[in-house]
């Protein structure tokens, strides 16, 4: 994010204007990770709803560096998912690169948002769920996924990138096996076994 542009937008806000406060609520701002734009890796990070009040609040005190102006076209219920699952998913999609065939391992909150963004970008989405999760597979297909199946069978094509949202470490070698040579595997979950 362009910090100068972000500060300018926030400076134009008035008291009472609506902003969104994401999961990452504050960092030290001086460590190598913060200086490199990788604040999510800061050892002194504080998280909204965990370390900081505000996860389900209508009002809270927040660090302006981590606030986003919410355009009026979004209702609160539409904007809120973008501030947690949406940010995690979008960042993961950016890290995954521009490949055409993207595999999403686990199809929950972040993956269903990424699916829609990737499809909008013209990519093919392959959704992989735990075996027997027909509901999630059906949901992925209803959003437009090219293919949806379980992690046991794997996708029908070689992937350019794989994004793991499921907290199951045993999926890492599977994803590596499903991605083409030189492809990218992104471990996007907050926790993984």
Regions of interest found by a model, annotated:
Residues 96, 126, 134-193:
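Glycine-rich cofactor phosphate-binding loops and adjacent beta1-alpha1 units
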Residues 1-67:
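Glycine-rich phosphate/adenylate-binding loop and adjacent beta-alpha elements
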Residues 72-152:
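Mid-domain Rossmann-like dinucleotide-binding core that forms the NAD(H)/NADP(H) cofactor-binding site
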Residues 8-11, 94, 177:
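Residue "hotspots" at secondary-structure boundaries inside conserved domains
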Residues 12-15, 98, 181:
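Short, flexible surface segments
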């Amino acid at each position: 994010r362009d910090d100068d542009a972000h500060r300018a937008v926030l400076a134009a806000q008035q008291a009472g204007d609506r902003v969104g406060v994401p999961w990452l609520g504050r960092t030290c701002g001086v460590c190598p990770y913060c200086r490199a734009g990788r604040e999510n890796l800061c050892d002194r990070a504080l998280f909204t709803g965990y370390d900081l009040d505000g996860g389900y609040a209508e009002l809270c005190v927040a660090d302006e560096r981590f606030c986003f102006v919410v355009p009026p076209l979004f209702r609160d219920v539409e904007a809120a998912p973008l501030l947690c699952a949406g940010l995690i998913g979008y960042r993961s999609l950016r890290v995954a690169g521009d490949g055409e065939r993207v595999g999403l391992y686990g199809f929950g909150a972040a993956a269903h948002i990424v699916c829609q963004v990737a499809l909008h970008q013209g990519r093919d989405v392959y959704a992989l769920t735990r075996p027997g999760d027909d509901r999630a597979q059906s949901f992925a297909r209803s959003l437009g996924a090219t293919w949806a199946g379980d992690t046991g069978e794997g996708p029908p094509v070689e992937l350019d990138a794989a994004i793991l949202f499921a907290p199951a470490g045993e999926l890492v070698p599977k994803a590596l096996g499903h991605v083409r040579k030189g492809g990218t595997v992104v471990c996007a979950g907050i926790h993984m076994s």
